[in-house]
């Protein structure tokens, strides 16, 4: 006997059983309920099949009996069959109710999975459309045109960052120039011209060539008579 290729999946085993026992295992269409204890019958008939283990056979039977087309066949009036397709008794009400429950749960799972897939697809399409759509630009506010008869208001001029310097306060007092230094005394207060400004000063020393005065900031300087005023 030639070595047969090893069966790797439950679907391959089901196809093998449908070919080996066509009156028991239905490859297409509504399946017939199997005889109670069909697993032991299969083990006995397939004991010489080296490409098939008991574990693989049990998994294949579990897949076959949980399929929708098998659960549809478990109904009132249906009869169980053996490996040769012979009737082996009617189904019990408990088995029929169990099959209906399994079928309803299987349908609910499929519907939930499909709904989840549709939701993910819509979400993915929405993200794709959002990424393609350019960001909307904010419209620039349009200036309202003046109505007939109204004058356009001039734009306010921007103020300079630096405040304008205050003009030096002019000394409005009427001063008398010093013509004779002999009238001056040490410690006397008077006015002195410093550049374009008139500042307070105190007499420190009187000499022939001029008068030495001290300003409020502590600076001492020699000043000619024509720059002094009362």
UniProtKB/Swiss-Prot annotation:
UniProt-annotated stretches for the region Disordered: 104-176
Residue pairs linked by disulfide bridges in the UniProt entry: none
Chain intervals with Basic and acidic residues compositional bias: 115-132
SMART domains associated with the record: ProQ
InterPro entries, per the entry: ProQ, ProQ/FinO, ProQ/FinO_sf, ProQ_C
GO terms of molecular function: RNA strand annealing activity; RNA strand-exchange activity
Highest taxon, organism lineage: Bacteria
Compartment(s): Cytoplasm
Record-level GO BP terms: post-transcriptional regulation of gene expression
Keywords, comma-separated and alphabetical: Chaperone, Cytoplasm, RNA-binding
Pfam families in the cross-refs: ProQ (PF04352), ProQ_C (PF17516)
Gene3D superfamilies: ProQ/FinO domain
GO terms for cellular component: cytosol
SUPFAM superfamilies assigned to the protein according to its UniProt record, in alphabetical order: FinO-like (SSF48657)
Function field: RNA chaperone with significant RNA binding, RNA strand exchange and RNA duplexing activities. May regulate ProP activity through an RNA-based, post-transcriptional mechanism.
Family from the record: Belongs to the ProQ family.
PANTHER family: RNA CHAPERONE PROQ
NCBIfam families on file: PRK04950.1
Identification of the protein by name: RNA chaperone ProQ
